[in-house]
A protein has these predicted regions:
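Short, small-residue-biased leader/transition segments that mark boundaries at the very start
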Residues: 1-5
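Alpha-helical scaffolding within the catalytic cores
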Residues: 7-17, 43-53, 76-84
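Oxyanion-hole/transition-state-stabilizing segment in secreted/luminal serine hydrolases
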Residues: 13-36
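Loop/turn elements at helix/coil->beta-strand transitions in domains of secreted/extracellular proteins
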Residues: 21-25, 58-64, 88-94
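Active-site rim elements
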Residues: 36-38, 101-111
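Substrate-gating cap/lid alpha-helix
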Residues: 68-100
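Surface beta-strand/loop "capping" patches
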Residues: 113, 120, 124-167, 185-187
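Solvent-exposed beta-strand/loop surfaces of large extracellular or lumenal domains
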Residues: 173-193
């Protein structure tokens, strides 16, 4: 069967039967099936969100998505970036799972933190119940400072810190040739300085 046919079947069997009912929002835990097509996903995800909102006729229903966890040897970083672009739509939230995944298994066993993050985000977005910090740091912007890049983050709670308290060691930079190499990175307040 073609991909279009499969998508139509999924919609017709899983979503269309729910249209007559009132709902409070969507939780979307994307599998890795599309992870090899991040550029296409940048179009598909926002289109799906917009389409479902139109069909349910309830305005900007909250849409909460789970960003793919870390997996070694893949290109999921580009897909995670594509997923994050959906945050540009109104009333869309994201639960980051990169820190709770298993680098050798795209289907991590520990899903409790992901559920807790979705719960806190839903409490804030859907029920307007302020819960304080409900997510980890979110990239905001960057600026070039000589031969270094200063990355700014928001939603930093009590400040940026590494998970294990050690120096940051998973950053990479690329030159004009497009080849990535390991980079040094340090935390400065709510910023990360990379070179």
């Amino acid at each position: 069967a073609s991909d279009v046919y499969k998508r139509q079947c999924m919609y017709n069997t899983k979503i269309a039967p729910l249209l007559p009912y009132g709902i409070r929002g969507f939780l979307w835990y994307q599998g890795e099936g599309n992870s090899g097509q991040p550029e296409l996903y940048k179009q598909l995800q926002p289109t799906m969100i917009t389409d479902w909102r139109i069909r349910f006729e309830q305005g900007y229903l909250p849409f909460l998505l789970v960003q793919l966890p870390n997996i070694s040897g893949g290109s999921c970083q580009y897909f995670r970036e594509a997923q994050a672009e959906s945050l540009q739509l109104p009333n869309v939230g994201m639960a980051v799972s990169i820190d709770v995944g298993d680098p050798y298994d795209i289907h991590p066993n520990n899903k409790k933190p992901v559920g807790e993050r979705l719960y806190l985000r839903a409490k804030e977005m859907v029920y307007k119940d302020s819960v304080g910090v409900f997510q980890g740091p979110v990239y905001d912007s960057f600026r070039i400072e000589g031969n270094k890049i200063r990355m700014k983050f928001k939603s930093t709670g009590s400040g940026l810190m590494s998970k294990d308290g050690k120096d940051l060691r998973t950053f990479e930079v690329a030159g004009e040739d497009g080849k990535y190499v390991p980079a040094k990175a340090v935390i400065e307040g709510n910023d990360v300085l990379v070179w």
